[in-house]
Amino acid sequence: SAGNFHGQPLALALDTAAIAIAEWASISERRTYLLVDGSDGLPPFLLERSGLQSGFMIPQYAAAALVSENKTLCHPACVDSIPSSRGQEDHVSMGAWGARKALRVIENAERVLAVEVLCAAQSLEFRRPLRAGRGVEAAHGAIRERVAYRTEDLTFEADLTAATDLVRSGALVAAAATETGPLP
C-alpha cells in the first residue's frame, strides 16, 4: 500500500526491551531468593520464628511466578505475522501486541523489584547495629515510612502495593540521591 506505516522497527525494539526487562526482573528474583533462603546468616524467610511462619516465602514465590510469566511473554511478537486486508498487508509486525506484552513485562518487573525491596528492607534489620551506605539507608528510610518491619505472618498485599508504588514512582532512587547526589 506504500503507506510506510509498517511497524516492524518498533515491534523489534519493543520485543527486545521486554526481553531485557525480563532478564533484569529475573536477576532481582534471584537476589530475593538469596535473602530468604537462610544461607547467609539471615533467618529463613526473614522472620525470627520462620519455622512456625512462612514470612517472606510467599512473596518470593510470587516474584518467581512473575518471572516465569515474563519468560512466556518474551516470545517475540514481531516474528509472528498473518496476512490481512485481503492479502494486501502481507507482512504484519504485530507491534501492538508486542507493546501490550512489553507493558505487562514492565508491570511484572516492578512487582518483582518491589518484593526484593521488601526483603532487602527486612534483611537490613537483622544486620543492626551495622549500617549500610548513606544512599541505602535513605532508601531504607523511605521504605520504612510506608512499610513496617515484620515480626509475624500477615498478608502482604498492602506492603507489596506500597513497595510497588515506591519502585514505580522513583521514590527510592530519589531518597538515595538525597544522600549520594544524582544517580544515573
Residue positions per predicted region:
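C-terminal auxiliary extensions adjacent to catalytic cores
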Residues: 1-184
